[in-house]
């Protein structure tokens, strides 16, 4: 089966989550992704949050499928020589080291261009070079705090909250992926590679654009009519936290369903659409609200929006969350059950679509991983297990022209 990136070689100098999520997707699209790891150590996530002693952690295996792994010590002369040969043959190099780390290895962008002017250099950092935080170490929640997500997440009477979704890490990887694919297309026109940089702060901010929209509206109006604070609460000079309210102008809230007293996920998310208000009233047994001037428009409803949700909840609390969604869907009401990770892991439809995939690694055995979220008509990514540390070192070196004796000597010299 032909794949979009067949014939593209990627050098993966990334670790933890932001970089590996990007290079894993490149591998799913058919690129030959070579993960370069420290001899005897490897990516730190191989050892983090283990569920089986001395076996690669799920943290690693779920972010590095379809890749090849080599152990390479770039501090040695032989290791640097191998690195230069790899760069010469590669199409893309991706790194997410601390600022300046790859330069200290001797591989500045200028030197890389000399070795291979067609190479595309992808780089993930916490902050842009012009940021005052450029030297701050960045992880997932650091990026959420600096990118505007934390200040706008949570309830108005509580502290900022970070999302459980990887807005700082995997989201940054997906943004870089888009940039790398664009750079590949640009190379087809120019014949030259380029540097593509992605800051975690920028990636989070790009998902918070509606909050920047709201900031400008707040500056002009002094209030935000779709937020729960309107019209009875107060607004400060910055976009407030809105709890579980919808952020796109359509009021929404988390509602209890049957069993909520003991099941922490017995809830649905319910959205009120202006154009679907009549159906909403019929669904919840309040047809009189259709023509009542206190309820007939979104502006009229906002002062007592929580009373409306409480009325809707009187119905949803009597039935199972799946029954609630099935019933409300008949009225074209946007809603969904709050699915636990346990439910997601067992969902047959997600298995069927390839969104959740079972793979097998030689030492770990079978495990679940998240599959490719995009569904293509011309090809289906074949999700394979993550590599063992150094599993492909000899094979990659042989492809570069090294003999068995030379490979043995490099191992003796701790270059691999």
Swiss-Prot record:
Enzyme Commission code(s) on record: 2.8.3.16
Keyword DNA-binding: no
Positions that bind substrate: 248-250
Pfam families: CoA_transf_3
Annotated keywords: Transferase
Top-level enzyme category: transferase
GO molecular function: formyl-CoA transferase activity
SUPFAM superfamilies for this protein: CoA-transferase family III (CaiB/BaiF) (SSF89796)
Residues forming the catalytic site: 169
Pathways involved: Metabolic intermediate degradation; oxalate degradation; CO(2) and formate from oxalate: step 1/2
Binding residue positions for CoA: 17-18, 38, 72-75, 96-98, 104, 137-140, 273-275
InterPro entries per the UniProt record, alphabetical: CoA-transferase_III_domain (IPR050483), CoA-Trfase_fam_III (IPR003673), CoA-Trfase_III_dom3_sf (IPR044855), CoA-Trfase_III_dom_1_sf (IPR023606), Formyl_CoA_transfer (IPR017659)
Reactions catalysed: formyl-CoA + oxalate = oxalyl-CoA + formate
GO terms under biological process: oxalate catabolic process
Function according to Swiss-Prot or TrEMBL: Involved in the catabolism of oxalate and in the adapatation to low pH via the induction of the oxalate-dependent acid tolerance response (ATR). Catalyzes the transfer of the CoA moiety from formyl-CoA to oxalate.
UniProt xrefs under HAMAP family: Formyl_CoA_transfer (MF_00742)
Subunit structure: Homodimer.
Family as reported in the entry's similarity comment: Belongs to the CoA-transferase III family. Frc subfamily.
Record-given protein name: Formyl-CoA:oxalate CoA-transferase
